[in-house]
Amino acid sequence: MDFSRLHMYSPPQCVPENTGYTYALSSSYSSDALDFETEHKLDPVFDSPRMSRRSLRLATTACTLGDGEAVGADSGTSSAVSLKNRAARTTKQRRSTNKSAFSINHVSRQVTSSGVSHGGTVSLQDAVTRRPPVLDESWIREQTTVDHFWGLDDDGDLKGGNKAAIQGNGDVGAAAATAHNGFSCSNCSMLSERKDVLTAHPAAPGPVSRVYSRDRNQKCYFLLQILRRIGAVGQAVSRTAWSALWLAVVAPGKAASGVFWWLGIGWYQFVTLISWLNVFLLTRCLRNICKFLVLLIPLFLLLAGLSLRGQGNFFSFLPVLNWASMHRTQRVDDPQDVFKPTTSRLKQPLQGDSEAFPWHWMSGVEQQVASLSGQCHHHGENLRELTTLLQKLQARVDQMEGGAAGPSASVRDAVGQPPRETDFMAFHQEHEVRMSHLEDILGKLREKSEAIQKELEQTKQKTISAVGEQLLPTVEHLQLELDQLKSELSSWRHVKTGCETVDAVQERVDVQVREMVKLLFSEDQQGGSLEQLLQRFSSQFVSKGDLQTMLRDLQLQILRNVTHHVSVTKQLPTSEAVVSAVSEAGASGITEAQARAIVNSALKLYSQDKTGMVDFALESGGGSILSTRCSETYETKTALMSLFGIPLWYFSQSPRVVIQPDIYPGNCWAFKGSQGYLVVRLSMMIHPAAFTLEHIPKTLSPTGNISSAPKDFAVYGLENEYQEEGQLLGQFTYDQDGESLQMFQALKRPDDTAFQIVELRIFSNWGHPEYTCLYRFRVHGEPVK
């Protein structure tokens, strides 16, 4: 079908139903033309407002309103695709048309109302001419329907809403139609004076009223349209949900990513909003609120102070009522004119614009005014009474003075001149009374002081007599004791003389003993001295301590020789071996039995941890190492375990080796350098008596020397593990050329303090530059009871 003739089409001017729109063959109301434009992607032929089917129905209804009939038909018989496209286009244009109609509707309503109130139609004509020439009667009908649907009319006036003010000859309708459409049809020209004019104005001005169509069926139609739109929206939502579910089933990864993307956007917007609110509240609102509170707090305090002063005083500060105008000045001379409020005025409500004033507040003000008026009336009555009393007083004064002066002058003199002489006499008498009263008080005080002095003297005499009586027997007792001391002293003198005689006897005995010793031991040397005798005894005899030391050394030497024999021969020592060990030890001239006894004692000592004393630092006995206060362990570079040439475990010993009994070469604790620390917790609290430091002998060393052995060391006693500097128990030196096990005696202390933590501090070694080795450290002493 060819639609090219649409471009040359001109709308008819006399069609009764023509409203100025080119909808007969345009794409807005022809499905064939719409399909043609959609197929060839052409723009609409006429760029004019497009009316919906609802507007056409409204136009038809408005034209037939004079006959009293409403005709509405829905002629939707197009295909589904054309309906959707046409609905989309008409919806957009209907929105723009409704907006313009809504704005123009307000202008026309204002102009019409002003024209009716003044009784003319000039404003109506101006409003009509202001409307765009593109709009026609359909615009009026659409406007009426829109106003009725959105509630722009006065819905309360239901009767007036259905009325139409039309002149008998229909001039208004014709003129309005001509003014709106720009042309006049044949039907409308019958009611007008001019028939062949395209643009006509009303012949005679007159009051014009708008025509409203309030058909109740339109509400049902609009409700149906709303339900249809809601259904379409629900269908779209369900379709979207179904597509989302289908996407989740078909491509769950994409759906999940989309969901997370939307959630991320929502969460980002939410966090942004919260941060913005936080910044806004803290930086702007908080500061403004603080300023507002700073300004508001003094106002609250002022209002509180005013309210505390009284409700009446508070209302007196309000500028609503001028209380100063209600009061007038009172005169004492005219007490009859006291203020009497007229309650009739207060009880009358305000007229006109003052009806909005709060009447309940005015009632409270009236009550306060009434109470104030009552008080003023009461004060007026009191003033009247005072005035009458003053007049009576003036009359009496006039009678007493005989009329010499006026009443006012006599009263003024009586009030203004005080009786000075009378006051002076009264003051003098009062002064004399006070002086006499003070004299009486002084006399009483004097009497009391004399009585107190007498009592003190009596008490003093009584005290002296009582003390004298008590001291007499005490003095007598002391005299007796003094006599006894004198007698004892005399007896002690005799004892002293006896002691002197005893000393003399002892000296005599010593002299005699010396002489006898000389006679016994130095017969050949009669002239020898006692010192020579002592030197002789010391050369032939030894002391007990030296003997014990020599025996201990002998046992150790024998034990070392026996141990060496056992380690070499791998057999038990025979008698010949024991004798040779004893002879090597330097003990010659002894029998085999004596040698066996010495060996047995040496073996017994060896079985007793080589010392025969309890080791309180032994780990198996309860001792332990405080590793947190020990020096750093020296790590050897020899790997005990490796994988593909990669060392996995290096050999190293912990400080626990020092308090364990196993001693063999290499089984020691080594620390870096020549200075180190070792802290040992003993098994119990003891009084330290001796310390033993053991190292391997040179004969067992692979290098033949023991340069890694400690040299100078000291032992300290600690009260707790957190004490930095303890009490010195002894400072010693280990001899590398001496025995492998060397014992050192602790220093004697006067307080004899007990300790459970001992610190071994090494100051130097015997020359090794890299490390120092400790094999065994023992602590001996007496446990605390």
Swiss-Prot record:
Keywords linked to the UniProt accession: Coiled coil, Differentiation, Disulfide bond, Isopeptide bond, Meiosis, Membrane, Nucleus, Phosphoprotein, Signal-anchor, Spermatogenesis, Transmembrane, Transmembrane helix, Ubl conjugation
Protein name per its UniProtKB record: SUN domain-containing protein 1
UniProt keyword Ribosomal protein present: no
Stretches assigned to the Nuclear side: 1-288
Gene Ontology biological-process entries: centrosome localization; homologous chromosome pairing at meiosis; meiotic attachment of telomere to nuclear envelope; nuclear matrix anchoring at nuclear membrane; nucleokinesis involved in cell motility in cerebral cortex radial glia guided migration; ossification; response to mechanical stimulus; spermatogenesis
One GO MF term attached to the UniProt entry: identical protein binding
Coiled-coil segments: 428-495
